[in-house]
Amino acid sequence: LRNSPTFFYSIQGIYEVSLTKPLGIIFEEIEVGKGVFVQDFVEGGLAERQGKIQKGDVLVAVTAVKIVGAKWERRLIPARTFNFDTAVGAIGSNEAKWGCNDVILMFERPGESNPEAVNTFFDFFEPPFDNPWKQQQ
């Protein structure tokens, strides 16, 4: 059972935060296909005041809203390969008109995590092929 991801244990070096918009985070792309990291904070912004996120933390998952016809759904999707625009788009999709009062973000703290375990965990949450935030390979 330990070889498969589960909701009942946490991955070392991964943490979750819930923030309202504007988040107050300045993201920067690591490199193509490697995701985004926290480059800095907006001075006095929510993320800085909350104090949980650190510069250098890597965004590994985020809630996003997907709209199909007259229906919508919000889910946590892996963000490890997102480029800057995709990450910002996913964050921005969490709008009050869809009943989203916050954005849930999961971060990896480099040096405190096991990247292989993190990858295995998030492979479980890989979005379906029709997800608008799924990167084209």
Each model region followed by its residue ranges:
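Intrinsically disordered, Ser/Thr/Pro/Gly-rich linkers and terminal tails that flank
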Residues: L1-Q137
